[in-house]
């Protein structure tokens, strides 16, 4: 090799070289963990523990496209506990949901019926329309909590009634092929008997049922219901490892062997075929074993926070059935922006995004106490300034998920 070529290669290697770790990385990571313990923005912010990292490094190192052993084992386990024939590991819950819809839907025109608050409608970048060419039928629960069979029967478009008559108006829509539910949705649990009633009727019409079960783990541990029973009414289910369970990445889609075989092809088409996923699969396995049981403590802490908010006079828009609380501080004269700013200004800041408070397996009980103390202080300040607390009752209507935003 000529000296000039060797020098050129060395120069290229120097250009490519990069060390992502800083001199203070360990301290920075610890600071980040402390901040996460005081954040109520989402349960997606949880981070892997050192124990999870250690466990993950022992996983097999194969290529998932060629049936990597650890990933294959995880898929088999998730299929077993959900009572389905097969499972597919994918990078995200969004991909899992969209793969399910794309696999179920054959020939347009067709529609997907879901709750108007559903993740597949609001937070998946229009994927239902883009990937599957499907329109969405958005339904508002008549009870303000969850979709019922009556809600679905009123809005579903069957093959023989594309000109749906409602409120003396005729509107055309594509026939519904999939009814998609979400459990939990905004932290609330759909009664299983309602799900079964919906499933029986939908299947009697020859349609499919999909469940966005990103947080189905919360339902299982809170109600003591086996995952198999929760998933049985559905043709496909998406389950997430990186939200409440605290794994760094990944979801599983479950269904029949034929369904998953087809979904695997779409996963490749979507760019979701991965290589050495053993580390990720092992992290998910660790989360199932060690983090899943912790969810019941998360729920208890959420109920404690809800109780404290009520005592102060805060209106609860949606109670802590699992890990989320939606609240309205206007009853004590405070708006979301003021609360966010005051929480952020604490010596040990607390992070809030708006009306939604999400607790997770790394939430500090002290953070709950500090948040309640701050809100109690704000209530006292408002009363001292002459504000008369209000008592708003009744079921809230409209969107209860309000993000704090300063007026422009």
Task: Report the location of each language-model feature.
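Conserved PLP-enzyme active-site core in the AAT-like
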Residues: 2-363, 367, 371-408
């Amino acid at each position: 090799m000529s000296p000039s070529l060797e020098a050129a290669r060395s120069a290229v290697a120097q250009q490519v070289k990069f060390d992502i770790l800083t001199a203070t990385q360990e301290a920075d990571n610890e600071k980040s963990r402390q901040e996460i313990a005081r954040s109520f923005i989402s349960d997606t912010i949880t981070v892997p523990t050192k124990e999870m990292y250690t466990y993950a490094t022992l996983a097999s190192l194969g290529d998932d496209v060629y049936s990597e052993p650890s990933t294959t084992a995880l898929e088999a386990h998730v299929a077993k506990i959900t009572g389905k024939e097969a499972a597919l590991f994918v990078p995200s819950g969004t991909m899992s949901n969209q793969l399910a819809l794309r696999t179920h839907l054959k020939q347009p025109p067709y529609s997907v019926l879901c709750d108007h608050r559903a993740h597949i409608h609001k937070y998946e970048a229009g994927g239902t329309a883009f990937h599957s060419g499907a329109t969405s039928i958005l339904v508002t629960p008549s009870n303000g909590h969850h979709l019922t069979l009556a809600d679905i029967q009123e809005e579903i478009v069957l093959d023989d009634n594309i000109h749906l008559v409602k409120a003396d108006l005729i509107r055309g829509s594509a026939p519904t092929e999939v009814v998609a539910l979400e459990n939990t949705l905004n932290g609330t649990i759909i009664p299983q008997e309602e799900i079964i009633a919906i499933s029986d009727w939908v299947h009697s019409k020859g349609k499919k049922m999909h469940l966005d079960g990103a947080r189905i783990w919360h339902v299982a541990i809170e109600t003591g219901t086996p995952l198999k029973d929760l998933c049985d009414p559905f043709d496909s289910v998406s389950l997430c490892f990186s939200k409440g369970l605290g794994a760094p990445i990944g979801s599983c889609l479950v269904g029949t062997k034929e369904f998953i075989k087809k979904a695997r092809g779409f996963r490749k088409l979507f760019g979701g075929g991965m290589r050495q996923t053993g580390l990720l699969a092992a992290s998910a396995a660790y989360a199932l074993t060690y983090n899943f049981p912790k969810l019941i403590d998360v729920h208890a802490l959420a109920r404690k926070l809800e109780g404290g908010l009520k005592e102060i006079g805060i209106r609860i828009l949606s109670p802590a059935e699992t890990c989320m609380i939606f609240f309205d501080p206007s009853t004590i004269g405070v708006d979301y922006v003021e609360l966010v700013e005051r929480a952020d200004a604490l010596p040990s800041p607390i992070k809030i995004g708006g009306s939604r408070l999400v607790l997770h397996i790394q939430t500090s009980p002290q953070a709950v106490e500090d948040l309640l103390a701050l809100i109690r202080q704000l209530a006292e300040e408002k009363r001292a300034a002459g504000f008369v607390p209000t008592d708003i009752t009744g079921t809230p209507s409209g969107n209860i998920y309000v993000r704090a935003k300063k007026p422009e």
